[in-house]
Amino acid sequence: MNQVMIANLMVSLSQTEKLQEGLVRHMVLNSLLNYRSEFKKKYGEFVLCYDNRHYWRRDAFPHYKGTRKRDREKSKHNWDNIFELLNKLKAEFLEHLPYKVVEVDGAEADDIIAVLCKQQGLANIRLQNNMQPPVKTLILSGDKDFIQLKRYGYVDQYNPCLKKWVEGLDPKLYISEHILKGDRSDGIPNFLSDDSCLVEGRRQKPLRKVLIAKWSTQSPEDFCTTPELMDQYERNRKLIDFECIPKEMSEKIIDTYESLVPANRSDLSSYFEENELNDLVSAVNYF
């Protein structure tokens, strides 16, 4: 949900420099209405997944997403006000929307999505054992981190910003390359580089495409020629590969999801009326 909300918020800021709470609320809810109308029949009901402020990855790697604060400081936008609004809308959606809204201490939305996709796989095995078709899962996000989840044949991914399906990439090869290259946007260097090079603004050690192509098909023991390289490879694997989500975090996500009771759909009209979402009142039965 963070991506959906920020995308709508940035569109609103492109129209006016002032942050308009009502406009952002309306845009986000209208997006949800459109997605539900398009995808519910095939994929079932929404699960809205949110990042928690505390990340287990930052406990494991203190520089995780360490470059983002610096980038926000360079931005012309007031990110304190933006986060305040996003948190307010999240609380409203948890209270009023008739869907499971999931936030777990220590987890990112990526973790929640990955764990629930894997959990659906176990449920699908039981369905198939009973001669029933598996349940399809759709990830509504353009984030390429989710390509690795497409190794599960029942998972599809749709990029709502580009309005196109994410497909054509080998999930196994993609995750292998991703571990080697790291993720600059998350402050994760390539595996040849030390922990702090990105947050300190230093250049990473060059990693040629020909070596990525070669090593992505090999075991790390074949090319990590020193203990330091192996440690840095494992650093990246732990942060990037969803198979490395800690067991206790996975269990907490499942417990939280299963305990959630969505808000009553019959109360949705009152929420829309209170916030002057008049055109959505007439569409309330489609939420």
Language model regions located:
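Low-complexity, acidic/Ser/Thr- and charged residue-rich accessory regions of DNA metabolism proteins
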Residues: 242-243, 247-287
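Helix-hairpin-helix
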Residues: 142-148, 168-231, 240, 246
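Noncatalytic, basic helical substrate-engagement surface that gates or grips nucleic-acid strands
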Residues: 1-138, 151-164, 241, 247-248, ...
